């Protein structure tokens, strides 16, 4: 019954997102100076959920560092097109950006998503290696930020990868950009009350991956790379970013939190979904500079 209710609500939200995206793309043009190679099949199976867009600067297209971006949507909805302008903006900061689609819950669970995105990150890593670069950076918003943390942590923690039944990504993860992260999935809140069974599978509390459902434990166990977190007044998951930053900062001073307390409230994932706004331009500029320092 709960899953049926979630599906129905998700369908409505997906329709709203599509309407917003169509309007936003009409109003905000795609920037000049960016070359888009769309819908590359990174799994080789022809499925729409396994397509990936690649954004390259028109000038010096094979010289910049490689960045992989994961869209948000709470694992239930979302699509790579929502982050189209964000990826183009990061491309203008000098990155070649890989933005993969991935299958969504409840059709699949989180471990399936991990496996598929591992292939996408490895593809991006091959491009980085061809450029003589040692690894890639990851960035994501909301659920995409969670995916950055977990894929990076599993690379450094074989026991965690084994508990997930996932082969770790091959390239070194040099740094993370985490926008409005949906880091916590099992708390007693509006997310944790319904999502865990669909995300981790029924009976997840008795399985080896359970300790890693706590992102703070995951970050400590996985030796998280330098991370730049973005949130703001108005972000309904602002407390997640603040709490997660406090947790990871106990172990390393390499992390940074940009917490905007401006004159107006900003929406969740504003930096990814509205990159043309002044606040997002500033946030993304700071994040790009942080990532470039670690590439």
Model-derived segments and their meaning:
Residues 1-295:
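Alpha/beta-hydrolase superfamily serine-hydrolase fold, recognizing
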């Amino acid at each position: 019954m709960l899953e049926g209710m979630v599906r129905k609500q998700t369908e409505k939200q997906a329709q709203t997102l599509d309407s917003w995206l169509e309007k936003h793309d009409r109003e905000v043009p795609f920037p000049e100076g960016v070359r888009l190679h769309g819908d590359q099949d990174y799994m080789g199976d022809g499925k729409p959920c396994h397509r990936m867009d690649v954004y390259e600067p028109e000038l010096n297209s094979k010289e910049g560092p490689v960045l992989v971006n994961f869209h948000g949507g709470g694992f239930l909805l979302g699509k790579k097109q929502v982050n189209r302008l964000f990826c183009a903006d990061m491309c203008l900061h000098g990155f070649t950006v890989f933005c993969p689609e991935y299958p969504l819950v409840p059709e699949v669970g989180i471990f399936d998503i991990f496996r598929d995105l591992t292939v996408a990150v490895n593809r991006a890593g091959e491009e980085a290696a061809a450029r003589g670069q040692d690894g890639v950076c990851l960035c994501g918003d909301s659920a995409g930020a969670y995916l950055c943390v977990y894929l990076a942590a599993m690379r450094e923690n074989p026991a965690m990868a084994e508990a997930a039944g996932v082969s770790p990504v091959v390239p070194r993860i040099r740094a993370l950009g985490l926008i409005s992260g949906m880091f916590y999935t099992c708390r007693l809140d509006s997310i944790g009350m319904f999502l865990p069974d669909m995300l981790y599978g029924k009976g997840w509390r008795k399985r080896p991956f359970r300790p890693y459902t706590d992102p703070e434990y995951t970050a400590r166990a996985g030796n998280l790379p330098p991370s730049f977190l973005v949130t703001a007044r108005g972000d309904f998951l602002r407390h997640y970013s603040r709490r997660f930053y406090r947790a990871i900062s106990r172990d390393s001073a390499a992390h940074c939190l940009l917490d905007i307390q401006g004159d107006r409230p900003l929406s969740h994932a504003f930096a990814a979904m509205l990159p043309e706004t002044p606040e997002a331009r500033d946030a993304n500029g700071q994040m790009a500079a942080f990532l470039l320092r670690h590439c």
